[in-house]
Amino acid sequence: MTTQTQHDLAPANQPEFELTVTPVPDEQRIDFWPQYFGAIPQWLLLEPHIFAWMDRFCEGYSGGIWSFYTLSNGGAFMSPEPDNDETWRLFNCLNGNDAQMSAEAAGIAVCLIAYSHHACRTECDAMTAHYYRLREYAMQHPEAHAILRIID
């Protein structure tokens, strides 16, 4: 049996493949958290913690409907539904950085913060994996720079 080895390396600043994002249909929203996070300790706290991080980082946030998304690498996240082309200004008082961004980018940023804190709190490898799946998508996002300013 012969094994073929690939020696071509992708440039460090370019992903090997583009991740795709898929909105979760309304009828599947009820299964979102248990399906993707059900094996993680205290997974029921994730959604309220994400809301709390958004409230902490975004002065203009006052609640609302959030959309759920899945990623082709097995990741999942949520973001607030915007009004038209509304942008959000996030300020992270923990690092002093702020950034103006789309609702999707804001959702990614606060999910990354919440996932990181939850992974540390629970010491759960599966939660850490969720963080890195979403971070991989964030690195390919058109607003990667703004997201990284907030989570730095």
Curated annotation (Swiss-Prot):
Gene3D superfamilies: Antirestriction protein (3.30.70.3580). Pfam families: Antirestrict. InterPro entries: Antirestrict, Antirestriction_sf. It comes from the Bacteria. Belongs to the antirestriction protein family. This is Uncharacterized protein YafX. It comes from Escherichia coli (strain K12). The lineage of its organism: Bacteria, Pseudomonadati, Pseudomonadota, Gammaproteobacteria, Enterobacterales. The gene is yafX.
